[in-house]
Design a protein with these regions (language model features):
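Glycine- and acidic-residue-biased ligand/ion/polar-headgroup-sensing regions
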Residues: 50-63, 79-80
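Phosphate-/nucleic-acid-contacting segments
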Residues: 161-219
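Cyclic-nucleotide recognition modules
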Residues: 29, 73-131
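Polybasic "coupling" helices that flank or enter modular domains
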Residues: 102, 120-185
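A cytosolic small-molecule/anion-sensing beta-strand core signal
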Residues: 37-38, 56-57, 78, 103
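Short phosphate-coordinating micro-motif centered on Lys-Gly-acidic
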Residues: 41-47
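Cyclic nucleotide-binding regulatory module and flanking cytosolic helices
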Residues: 1-38, 82-83, 87-90
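Cytochrome P450 core scaffold surrounding the K-helix E-X-X-R motif
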Residues: 63-69
Length: 219
């Protein structure tokens, strides 16, 4: 079904857009929305990115896996959420994570042809999209240059933060301690001791093959 155009003004891609500009867009561009149930897949890893997918309401689980599938990070993300807009253009136009509805979600989908039309018609839309993609690119470009700390606890924290889509909120790292030890260049015992020190500080919860972080911004 078609989305209420006036509600778009509250969403990141349309912030700052005047009502007259929105009225012109409404006549030329078709923007559809759907209501999804809990568990519905909104985008899958390696699926072609052929549209901008914007979650207007609800909560989403984003799962990102290593190339060898030896570890996975699951993030709880809140609306409004634009799902990997940087992948609609460029060399690799495929999603690198799987996004699943954790609650009832209202999802807006703008097909690539309509995205190009919006960019042509509206400078506000064009600047908003460019700013979102540029901010994401700048955040990613700094990750490889963070200094590797000798402290194992800080290494674990950096490992998790560098692999998250959003730098705050609830996260899960699903892996074995032996894998984490291999990735960080230390022993399994050192990893185990460091994790339990972080758990004693109530910064995370250690379970079998799962490390839960209630609030990443506190790490």
């Amino acid at each position: 079904m078609n989305y209420d155009f006036h509600s778009l003004l509250q969403l990141p891609l349309f912030l700052g857009m005047g009502r007259s500009e929105l009225a012109d867009i409404e006549q030329e561009v078709s923007i559809g929305s759907t209501h999804t149930k809990r568990g519905a897949i909104l985008a899958s890893e390696n699926e072609a990115c052929t549209a901008l997918v914007l979650v207007a309401k609800g909560t989403v689980l984003a799962s990102t896996r290593s190339d060898d599938h030896s570890y996975e990070i699951v993030e709880t993300l809140q609306a409004p959420l634009l799902i990997q807009p940087e992948h609609i253009f460029g060399i690799k136009q495929r999603y690198t994570a799987t996004f699943k509805a954790s609650t009832y979600c209202e999802v807006i989908r703008i097909e690539k042809q309509m995205v190009l039309k919006l960019m042509e018609m509206s400078m506000t839309f064009r600047l908003n999209l460019m700013n979102i993609i540029a901010t994401q690119s700048q955040r990613y470009s700094r990750r490889l240059w963070h200094q590797m700390n000798e402290n194992i606890e800080k290494r674990i924290v950096r490992f998790i933060k560098d692999r998250c889509i959003y730098p705050a909120g609830q996260k899960q790292l699903r892996t074995k301690m032996t894998v984490l030890a291999r990735e960080l260049g230390c022993s399994r015992l050192e990893i185990s001791e460091a994790l339990h020190r972080l758990e004693e500080k109530q910064l995370l919860i250690v379970k079998r093959t799962i490390i839960e972080i209630p609030m990443l911004q506190l790490l």
